[in-house]
């Protein structure tokens, strides 16, 4: 950027009616080179140290003289009328510079005029003449003197150099353009003078002196001898500076336009406000009045009404252009949009409610019975606090979809929020209004969306709530799900109590283990366990197949699935307690048929079991079915996972070893390993009762294995199974055919109850098991299960391990190569033979 160092002289110094400005654009001939004649040079030239400026040949500029030595030099040069040398300092902060503080190249200069300024300072108007090389400083008092060597400025040859002419012209144009972009434009006289000056050296030096860059860069330009090279270097710097100036100008223009726009809008708003006030109101008043009118129809308490009116008065005092206006308006609109005292009318037709539940879901009798009971109480009493129900069970059994059916059967609105992965307490309680972008929590948002205060509210995946430094959402749910507290639920954003006691909350979970105990205590737990194969067949025939046919463009009866086909589909292509994967496999079959129909191929209208391999490929799963058992040490246990029950084979083998050892394999967890250790220790302690010789433990090593080693297994319920397996292996007694068991074992031989009984029973029935051994305390769990699940099963309830072994083991022994007892007898015979040999040796001696 070109520096604006113009000094206006007095009125009496005007020439031809124009004030004189500096730097002065000298009226010079086109070929003038500003050289100094050698005979005009002094042997020792006064040297003036310049701070923060560079003087170029031909350029005139003001120098503010501040240092005492510099003032003496100016007085001396003015009096004698001689030249002096102007050299820039490397560091402007140095007060007493020496040779090392000065650049190597300076400019011979002459004084045009010395001005005494009104503030008492002295300003010298000087003009550069020719460059020189500073050789040495010869004196420092009363001012610096030194020897110099003149340096020529090399112009192109006498023949016209069109490239150089174009270069100079470009520099001149860019300099003028930069003047036009300046915030305060230079005087018109300066611009006109620069346009008229055709001296190439002057044009280059003037632009070099006034470009906005560092002193070091300007000094670099001064030290370039060839004017053409100096011009190209200058052109690069000018181009760079011009880009910056154009960008600044663009930014300033945009800023100015934006400010003008804002001022215009402000004035228009003021005018509109004035006009509306003259007419009797304004926009703000109209909006507030509409809200106040709507508030008269609300069925809210006096506390809410007072709070709303107070917040509305705050809104009235705010200007619509205020940043707080939109925040306050949002809060007021949130209050008035909530369903205060608005309720859906319950449908008390119990038969219709039962038919809706039966239509949408097969089975799940316990859940349906609980909903009908709630409706019956409402019908008799007219009002009651809604229950907090938690449906827990494996995926795909219909827990979430059951909420929709319950809402339809009751005639209520349905809302659902997913809590999976939720880790911020503010998602439940909302954010305080002091935060930017604050809003109410998801509970209040859902009620706002429902439009009633008594919807069926599904809290999906409540067992997958997380917590972090932002808080624990499960703790916030304690207030929501407590019938004694939720009649005054406090949302941080709303800051007003809201009644949730009429909301029917239904939570869903896959497992109860990850839910906090206080939260569990507030909910009524209903086990939605898996379906048996007969139920899955009915669900597929009634719901899944018709649904998928319609979704794929068929009518409900266009394609038939036989019962055996559905059973094979369930057995060979799914492994779940629910029906989600079953629906996917049905959809896959129908897609294949849809493709046939779309290609005008004769498509299948009835799917047989043999067609499944064609449509779905080879069976994905092979069920662990009981095939009979003739081996000692192989016992069937029952396990339970989040996706349902499974049968579990536990195998025990023995092999000879030098020392006793128990080996456990099959990816077992710590609890299951402990069960094996307890089982073996119990057998050792009661070996006499079980008919097992202690010598066996000293000479045989025990290996317990649970197949499917890639799957982690853990839990205490395999305790009695491991005892039975070990006793069978050690005694070689056969295990009763078709029997499975589950239960925990103690060191005293007591059998303790376990969980997941229904899932385990379904797994046993699915695998062809006919008899099950359970703990006596699990009898109550069996009594709660529908008889349809128990058909074909015989239960043995036990309290100790002796009863387990009595029911599970036969007296018949397995005949195989592992002859433990012959090994024991052989050992005794060997000992007797050894003793006899020892006695014979002693007699011979």
Curated annotation (Swiss-Prot):
Annotated Lon N-terminal domain residues: 45-242
Uppermost EC category: hydrolase
CC annotations in GO: cytoplasm
Main location: cytoplasm
Domain annotation Lon proteolytic: ranges: 629-811
Summary of subunit composition and partner proteins: Homohexamer. Organized in a ring with a central cavity.
Name of this chain's protein: Lon protease
